[in-house]
């Protein structure tokens, strides 16, 4: 999905730089004048910090505190059993999502606060799989080929709301991060709002959303 988006914007003339770790920023007169990466320095009139669970570390490099905590979630991808429901569904009490994807089945869930740790906790994985037979007794654990066991980090904030807006002390820096478990769902409207903020098109009464609730400095002492 992300690769498809990158390919689309490249066709529109956007330069996408991969494998480029940000190492720091140069600031002058309250603005970022250069972003230093492992593939060279980048100068831009506007900078958008939208790096998911890594946003806090980049914010620190820019002198912008962002209280974002990574919350690990897991998924297990199996060969899709015959006769399985066509639609994705949620096992609400167990907080497990079951998603058919072509000839595969993805079962995901849980929330683990373990910092930037990408290791697989197999007890968490077992708990996800063990939840399924309680709802679908025909599902037999161990009788289906596991194609992939995966974990990812969700960027969570103290109040559950993302950060979205300009940084008061760094005038050309916009933050869009901390969307927790619904980053894909909120991605389109977030992109629209970031564009409006940068272009100066957003009026205070534009759509029924108070961006002050998402202010980057709302937890500042």
Ranges and model annotations:
Residues 1-45:
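Helical element adjacent to the flavin cofactor pocket in flavoenzyme catalytic cores
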Residues 27, 33-85, 121:
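Central helical "cap/lid" subdomain
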Residues 27, 167-221:
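C-terminal lid/capping helical subdomain adjacent to the catalytic/cofactor pocket in oxidative enzymes
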Residues 34-36, 106, 174-175:
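General beta-strand recognition
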């Amino acid at each position: 999905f992300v690769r498809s988006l990158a390919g689309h914007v490249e066709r529109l003339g956007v330069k996408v730089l991969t494998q480029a770790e940000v190492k720091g920023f140069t600031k002058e007169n309250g603005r970022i004048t250069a972003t230093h990466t492992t593939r060279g320095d980048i100068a831009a009139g506007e900078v958008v910090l939208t790096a998911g669970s890594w946003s806090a570390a980049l914010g620190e490099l820019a002198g912008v505190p962002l209280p974002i905590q990574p919350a690990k979630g897991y998924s297990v991808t199996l060969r899709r059993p015959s006769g399985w429901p066509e639609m994705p569904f949620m096992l609400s009490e167990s907080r497990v999502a079951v998603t058919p994807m072509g000839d595969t089945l993805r079962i995901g869930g849980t929330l683990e606060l373990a910092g930037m740790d990408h290791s697989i906790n197999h007890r968490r994985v077992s708990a996800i799989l063990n939840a399924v037979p309680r709802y679908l007794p025909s599902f037999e654990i161990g009788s289906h080929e596991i194609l992939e066991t995966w974990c990812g980090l969700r960027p969570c904030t103290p109040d559950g709301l993302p950060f979205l807006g300009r940084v008061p002390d760094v005038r050309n820096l916009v933050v869009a991060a901390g969307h927790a478990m619904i980053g894909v769902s909120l991605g389109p409207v977030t992109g629209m709002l970031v564009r409006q903020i940068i272009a100066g098109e957003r009026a205070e009464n534009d759509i029924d959303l108070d961006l002050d609730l998402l202010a980057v400095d709302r937890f500042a002492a």
